[in-house]
Swiss-Prot record:
Residues 379-422, 480-538, 554-643 are annotated as: Disordered. The lineage of its organism: Eukaryota, Metazoa, Chordata, Craniata, Vertebrata. GO terms for cellular component: focal adhesion; nucleoplasm; presynapse; synapse. This is ARF GTPase-activating protein GIT2. InterPro entries: Ankyrin_rpt, Ankyrin_rpt-contain_sf, ARFGAP/RecO, ArfGAP_dom, ArfGAP_dom_sf, GIT-like, GIT1/2_CC, GIT1_C.
Length: 759
């Protein structure tokens, strides 16, 4: 396969890049994840092969590539290409989708249910429709249009259809026309190369008469594909059909199973099976060989990046609904056979297939017809099961059964003697070493990947630790350099002398400090009736460095849902809030519509938008609120340190509430809401009963009302009337909204307090 062709290929099911598997009967290429789902469906739905690590007949691979390049995938996704399918909500899987359930459900609908295949108009008789389709297939195989034939086969055309007027099958027509790729496609869908037409000729005869020698040789290989695959599984070689040799039969030498009466009885019952039952058993063993070989390739090609992956494991043959329950159960029990037992069964099948093909007679009497699977399964005496148990039971682990002890253990080596081999070949050793090597390589890759992941995580943790230590050191330095110095004597004036205080212009270029930054330094607490001069605050306050803009305490809640943290915000957010405080009116950020949005006249008498009423110093002529005329408005606010300390308590309790919501611990809602309410009450008590600023009043109102709403919503989680169940999901949304409002109000109060106290 050319590199240019392979680089442009994508998975037919999820459009992932660089597919490494192929579905032979569907004409598509698959990625690893989609292939795992195909394997779980069974070979009757999808026949998967690895593009590099599986031996391919050249013409078979060419047939799959031709189908893929000619758009065979559009056959299985016909309705998805219709624009109307977008309106119906159906869509194709994406590479980022999870294997379960997204990709698995789509693949089952696409190939097992054929939900997206173009449907013909309904007719009263389905047999007439199938007959018409088969006649169209009979006419199409003489051309090289593979996609048309695959479309007819997907609609129900029969690959072995015998044309009543022409007296032959589609494979006869394709062989006579020399269409080797059409012959490959028909053989995949069950066409028999040994079928004779009305003249007694086979497709091989027509291929040789037409001079298509490569096609004739390939048809012979297809005719012996089952026995060739079984022989190749045991000894890694295939017969030389060109020279007339069609069977390679390894012989078990000096084996205890061959000498046991149980093995002799099993072999005798195998020989007594009718041709029909023997064909069924041989096909089941062929499917089991395909499963084991695909398993070996699967383990060797996976990177084992995780201890548990989403990809599907296929421990035994999947159920085929066209087979009986007894046959499906017997097919699944083939997975119990260890390497030696399965090799013995394969050799017996090869021997009897050769005998039946050559027409040799049996010596001895014939027993009653009975499936060989039931007899050989009696060797597992410890794991014996009743046939009345439910079908498709789980297959036990592949543990080898101890063989009967013999007199000399040194003479127990089991070897295979092929009729063309130069020396003995040990089946058990070959299979055990092969399986052990594959398992060891997979384990090594898995451990190396896990080791690399752990090393990467360790490096990341070390970097995070160094970053936290550096930030902690910087914060300590800033705390020592920015401590407010408590001045004595004339640095504070009597608050009664309001004329000595002047309003300081707002510093538009500075950004408001985050709550964690402000809390790092210690500022003297001013009583309710006192305030520091703006000039002195301006001289003593130094801005924090730009790199300290986010609190390290919030990292513990990074796994919680998106939530406005009251402990930190980004530099851009801080600058935006500072600009909003200085340039806009006094309306705070709120989700409610009853917030006042009016103008305040400045000292010159002109109405200007953007003057902050909360940034007013005593003596500026405040107008008392008419709501409570007996309470005089207070011009002072609590210290920033006290507000931050209470806000941190609120934030900690909100984080506990959100963790409870994330973990569905609804019984923790009420205790968390009570702790939040207590913290909110303590924070509200810091502020005067009648604050001067509209922003402070609005934020306090939002803070307290949201706390009461939170308690009310959390009480809804208590078990109530059984007739009216509570929608827990809706309650959780309301609880999160209330917590959001509380955090938002607390952040507004911190911003206002920080701005006021810095002026």
């Amino acid at each position: 396969m050319s590199k240019r062709l392979r680089s442009s290929e994508v998975c037919a099911d999820c459009s992932g890049p660089d597919p490494s598997w192929a579905s032979v009967n569907r004409g598509t290429f698959l990625c690893d994840e989609c292939c795992s789902v195909h394997r779980s469906l069974g070979r009757h739905i999808s026949q998967v092969r690895h593009l590099k690590h599986t031996p391919w007949p050249p013409t078979l691979l060419q047939m799959v590539e031709t189908l893929y390049n000619n758009g065979a995938n559009s056959i299985w996704e016909h309705s998805l290409l219709d624009p109307a399918s977008i309106m119906s909500g159906r869509r194709k899987a994406n590479p980022q989708d999870k294997v379960h359930p997204n990709k698995a459900e789509f693949i089952r609908a696409k190939y097992q249910m054929l939900a997206f295949v173009h449907r013909l108009p309904c007719r009263d008789d389905d047999s007439v429709t199938a007959k018409d389709l088969s006649k169209q297939l009979h006419s199409s195989v003489r051309t090289g249009n593979l996609e048309t034939c695959l479309r007819l086969l997907s609609l129900g055309a029969q690959a072995n259809f015998f044309h009543p007027e022409k007296g032959n099958t589609p494979l006869h027509v394709a062989s006579k026309a020399g269409q080797i790729l059409q012959a490959e496609l028909l053989a995949v869908y069950g066409a028999d190369p040994g079928t004779q037409d009305s003249s007694g000729k086979t497709p091989v005869d027509y291929a040789r008469q037409g001079g298509h020698h490569e096609l004739a040789e390939r048809l012979v290989e297809i005719q012996y594909e089952l026995t060739d695959r079984l022989a190749f599984y045991l000894c890694g070689r295939k017969p030389d059909h060109k020279n007339g040799q069609h069977f390679i039969i390894p012989q078990m030498a000096d084996s205890s199973l061959d000498l046991s009466e149980l093995a002799k009885a099993a072999k005798k019952k195998l020989q007594s099976l009718s041709n029909h039952l023997f064909e069924e058993l041989a096909m089941d063993v062929y499917d089991e060989v395909d499963r084991r070989e695909t398993d070996a390739v699967w383990l060797a090609t996976q990177n084992h990046s995780a201890l548990v992956t989403e990809t599907t494991v296929v421990p035994f043959l999947p159920v085929n609904p066209e087979y009986s329950s007894t046959r499906n159960q017997g097919r699944q029990k083939l997975a119990r056979f260890n390497a030696h037992e399965f090799a013995t069964l394969v050799i017996d099948i090869l021997s009897d297939a050769k005998r039946r093909q050559q027409g040799s007679s049996l010596s001895g009497s014939k027993d009653n017809v009975e499936l060989i699977l039931k007899t050989i399964n009696n060797q597992h005496s410890v794991e014996s099961q009743d046939n009345d148990q439910p079908d498709y039971d789980s297959v036990a682990s592949d543990e080898d059964t101890d063989l009967e002890t013999t007199a000399s253990k040194t003479n127990r080596q089991k070897s295979l003697d092929s009729d063309l081999s130069d020396g003995p070949v040990t089946v058990q050793e070959f299979m055990e070493v092969k399986n052990a090597l594959v398992a060891s390589e997979a384990k090594i890759q898995q451990l190396m990947k896990v080791n690399n992941n752990l090393s990467d995580e360790l490096r990341i943790m070390q970097k995070k630790l160094q970053t936290l230590q550096s930030e902690n050191s910087n914060l300590r330095k800033q705390a020592t350099t920015n401590v407010y110095q408590v001045q004595t004597g004339s640095e504070y004036t009597d608050t009664s002398n309001h004329s000595s205080l002047k309003r300081r212009p707002s510093a538009r270029g500075s950004r408001p400090m985050s709550m964690y930054e402000t809390g790092s330094g210690q500022k003297p607490y001013l009583p309710m009736g006192e305030a520091s001069r703006p000039e002195e605050s301006r001289m003593r306050l130094q801005p924090f460095p730009a790199h300290i803009g986010r609190s390290a305490l919030v990292t513990s809640s990074s796994s919680l849902p998106s939530f406005p943290s009251t402990l930190s915000w980004s530099r851009d957010e801080s600058a935006r809030r500072a600009s909003r405080l200085e340039k806009q009116n006094s309306t705070p950020e709120s989700d409610y519509d009853n917030t006042p949005n009016d103008m305040e006249p400045d000292g010159m008498g002109s109405s200007r938008k953007g003057r902050q009423r909360s940034m007013v110093w005593p003596g500026d002529g405040l107008v008392p609120d008419t709501a409570e005329p007996h309470v005089a408005p207070s011009p002072t606010l609590p210290s920033t340190e006290d507000v931050i300390r209470k806000t941190e308590q609120i934030t900690k309790n909100i984080q506990e509430l959100l963790r409870a919501a994330q973990e569905n611990k609804h019984d923790s809602y009420i205790p968390c809401s009570e702790r939040i309410h207590v913290a909110v009450t303590e924070m509200a008590a810091l502020f005067p009963k009648k604050p001067k600023s509209d922003m402070v009043r609005t934020s306090l109102r939002l803070l307290t009302s949201s706390a009461y709403r939170l308690q009310s919503e959390c009480k809804k989680t208590l078990p109530g009337d059984p007739g009216s169940p509570t929608d827990v999901q809706l309650v959780t949304q309301q609880v999160i909204q209330c917590a959001y409002d509380i955090a938002k109000a607390a952040k507004q109060l911190v911003t206002i307090t920080t701005k006021e106290n810095n002026n």
